[in-house]
Amino acid sequence: MWLKLILAIVILIECIVVIYLPSHIESRIMNKKKHKIFNMENFENVASGAILALAFIHMLPEVIGLLNKNNLTIYCCFGLILISVTFLNITDILYDHHTENCSDIDNAEKNTNKFTINSASDKNIRDHIDIEMESLSIKENTNLSNNFIFDTFKSNAFFIVLSLFIHSFVEGLLIGSLKDKNPIIIVGLSMIAHKWAECLMIYKNAVKKTKDPILSSIYAWSFILSLPLGILVAVLSFSSNEFVEIIFSSIACGFFLYLSFNMTKDITVTKANKFYISFSYFFGVCGMSTLMIVFNYLEKSNVV
């Protein structure tokens, strides 16, 4: 019981630090000269590579094992992965479309304001502009009132957090359901070794992109508390559903594959930084792959 509690506290602290520390680092280095190696782009590349390794070495084999255990075809997993990748593409398109619409409304309002100043002497035109301004104001207020709903249900941040919350919750159930000391230590260390990459994904794709501070905090703390909550539920003797684990682990695997490449799309590659960008991504893949292989071996060998 105490060992599980210690692991839950360590992972909780790790998640808090990794989710909230990058924003402070970015604000400090914003006005400083960019370092060739130690900068946010390279750190994000390491995380992207680690996420790719997690998808192939940790999550996909886990799902395939559950499918074999329940005599289900592997195409179920690949179908869910394909659906999740397609879904994130659609939500990205919707998000970009929403951003463009907001920009168009702002530009229209600015142009109308200029037209009002230049034509103030004409009463008919002024009345027409007043009506147009009122319409724009109503439209803008409607957009503002719907922002919370849009950010919650139409951006991919919500679905990323939901999927990773359930996946992390199930990992907590796994730790909480173990009885022997050695497996608890091995599985716990494995969680600690890869949880930072998931935290960076939450920060990059949910916390950082969400303008509403309350919603951003909800996203962050939902994921931070997911694994300790899973441990608590398992300790209280609630069993997990393997079919639910198959569904959400497959979806999370698709999210990992998509986000591994999506997180690097805004990086500009130049002659000066292309080596560091390639090396950091390769380092993330190799480092996480090595960790997962070692912990999987220890878990199967029952050696600490």
UniProtKB/Swiss-Prot annotation:
<keyword id="KW-0406">Ion transport</keyword>
<dbReference type="InterPro" id="IPR003689">
    <property type="entry name" value="ZIP"/>
</dbReference>
<comment type="function">
    <text>Putative transporter for the divalent zinc and iron cations. Required for the development of liver-stage parasites.</text>
</comment>
<feature type="transmembrane region" description="Helical">
    <location>
        <begin position="243"/>
        <end position="263"/>
    </location>
</feature>
<keyword id="KW-0408">Iron</keyword>
<dbReference type="GO" id="GO:0005886">
    <property type="term" value="C:plasma membrane"/>
</dbReference>
<feature type="transmembrane region" description="Helical">
    <location>
        <begin position="183"/>
        <end position="203"/>
    </location>
</feature>
<keyword id="KW-1133">Transmembrane helix</keyword>
<keyword id="KW-0472">Membrane</keyword>
<dbReference type="GO" id="GO:0005385">
    <property type="term" value="F:zinc ion transmembrane transporter activity"/>
</dbReference>
<feature type="transmembrane region" description="Helical">
    <location>
        <begin position="275"/>
        <end position="295"/>
    </location>
</feature>
<keyword id="KW-0862">Zinc</keyword>
<feature type="transmembrane region" description="Helical">
    <location>
        <begin position="158"/>
        <end position="178"/>
    </location>
</feature>
<keyword id="KW-0812">Transmembrane</keyword>
<feature type="transmembrane region" description="Helical">
    <location>
        <begin position="218"/>
        <end position="238"/>
    </location>
</feature>
<feature type="transmembrane region" description="Helical">
    <location>
        <begin position="1"/>
        <end position="21"/>
    </location>
</feature>
<feature type="transmembrane region" description="Helical">
    <location>
        <begin position="74"/>
        <end position="94"/>
    </location>
</feature>
<keyword id="KW-0410">Iron transport</keyword>
<keyword id="KW-0813">Transport</keyword>
<keyword id="KW-0864">Zinc transport</keyword>
<dbReference type="Pfam" id="PF02535">
    <property type="entry name" value="Zip"/>
</dbReference>
<dbReference type="GO" id="GO:0006826">
    <property type="term" value="P:iron ion transport"/>
</dbReference>
<feature type="transmembrane region" description="Helical">
    <location>
        <begin position="46"/>
        <end position="66"/>
    </location>
</feature>
<protein>
    <recommendedName>
        <fullName>Putative metal ion transporter ZIPCO</fullName>
    </recommendedName>
</protein>
<keyword id="KW-1003">Cell membrane</keyword>
